[in-house]
From Swiss-Prot:
The gene is Otulinl. Residues 1-80 are annotated as: Required for membrane binding. This is Inactive ubiquitin thioesterase OTULINL. Pfam families: Peptidase_C101. Lacks deubiquitinase activity. It is a peripheral membrane protein. One of its GO terms (biological process) is protein linear deubiquitination.
Length: 353
């Protein structure tokens, strides 16, 4: 009887326990599922964040690399295609002076006073800086001849200057001209006549073109183009050197027949280093463009050969009679005038009035 009574209780207890287990099971399973899903999601998020971080780091490195390469190529192309003008654009004279001559040394004070003299007394407002090398005097003169559209000297109108190299050799027996040196190239040999002919031919062609051009702005644009080509420039300057040599040779032959010649040539041939055209070429002319520029007597010969009055403001001679000089000293009145300025008789720039 006792066992019979306890059976329902056991069944009731069993049903209660079973229900609790079912409830616990229903709670535990979703919890485990959610936990598993969370772990998977967290792992996925961490993986995604790691990939994103790596991707951002890669693109940042790529961006920096490409930026560096782009900057390098931009600089290269700018250097490659930028016009390397050997005669720069106009700069305000006093601003140029202030930039170049700072401090209170006696030299700096002298230069500032000289530039102020140019500005106030001679009305020079700007300066065109010229590339500093051993051709700068020739460059400064030729640039102004072309930019002003000056015509040929009278003697060049009467002769075909392209044939002058052969004329010196065959008509005047100057076989020593084979020792002519083309500035830093130091070229000598049997082909020197061909090289000189090409140089003189280029000078004649360019001079003819500029002198026939009436548009000032067009001449300026063409000058900027021409004076940014170093190879063409050198050929033009060698042509000018040869014309100087030709004039020296012509005057030397005239002196043999006791003809009256300009005093500057007597001074030239009185020097121990240039008693004749060959010595002048070997000891002076061949070095121009290579180890030295034009000295004062060379400037005289250049002005005489091109039939221009070269007025030079020698700033280091401020407050003296040699502050402004002409090459040659007694030019003919009808010769056109061009102006240069120098701080030391070695480097020349172009004043703009």
């Amino acid at each position: 009887m006792k066992a019979t009574r306890s059976a329902p209780r056991e069944r009731e207890r069993s049903r209660t326990t079973s229900g609790s287990d079912q409830v616990h099971s229903w709670i535990l399973v979703p919890s485990q599922v959610l936990h598993a899903v969370w772990r998977i999601a967290r792992a996925s998020v961490m993986t995604a964040l790691s990939l994103l971080s790596a991707t951002l780091s890669y693109f940042r490195s790529l961006y920096l690399y490409l930026g560096h390469q782009l900057k390098w190529w931009i600089g290269y192309l700018q250097r490659k295609f930028k016009r390397n003008l050997s005669v720069e654009a106009e700069v305000d004279l006093l601003s140029y002076c202030a930039r170049e001559w700072k401090g209170e040394t006696p030299r700096a004070r002298l230069m500032r006073k000289a530039y102020e003299e140019l500005f106030w007394r001679y009305h020079v407002k700007c300066v065109r800086p010229v590339k500093r090398d051993n051709y700068d005097a020739l460059r400064s003169v030729l640039f102004q001849i072309f930019s002003q559209g000056l015509s040929f000297p009278s003697w060049m109108k009467e002769k075909d200057i392209v044939k002058l190299p052969e004329k010196l050799l065959f008509s005047q027996g100057c076989n020593w001209i084979q020792q002519y040196s083309f500035g830093p190239e130091k070229y000598t040999g049997s082909n020197v006549f061909g090289k000189l002919r090409k140089c003189v031919e280029l000078l004649k062609l360019q001079w003819t073109e500029f002198s026939g051009m009436r548009d000032y702005h067009k001449r300026g644009s063409m000058c900027n183009s021409l004076f940014s080509d170093a190879i063409l420039e050198c050929k033009l300057y060698e042509a000018l050197k040869f014309l100087m040599l030709y004039q020296v040779t012509e005057v030397y032959e005239q002196m043999k027949t006791n003809k009256i010649v300009p005093s500057l040539f007597r001074l030239l041939f009185s020097r121990e280093s240039s008693p004749d055209p060959l010595s002048f070429m070997m000891n002076h002319l061949n070095s121009i463009g290579d180890t030295c520029g034009l000295d004062q007597i060379d400037m005289f010969i250049l002005g005489y050969s091109l039939q221009v009055k070269i007025k030079v403001f020698r700033l280091f001679k401020f407050n003296s009679r040699d502050f402004a000089v002409y090459y040659p000293e007694e030019p003919l009145r009808e010769w056109p005038e061009i102006s240069l300025l120098t701080e030391n008789d070695h480097q020349y720039h172009i004043p703009v009035f």
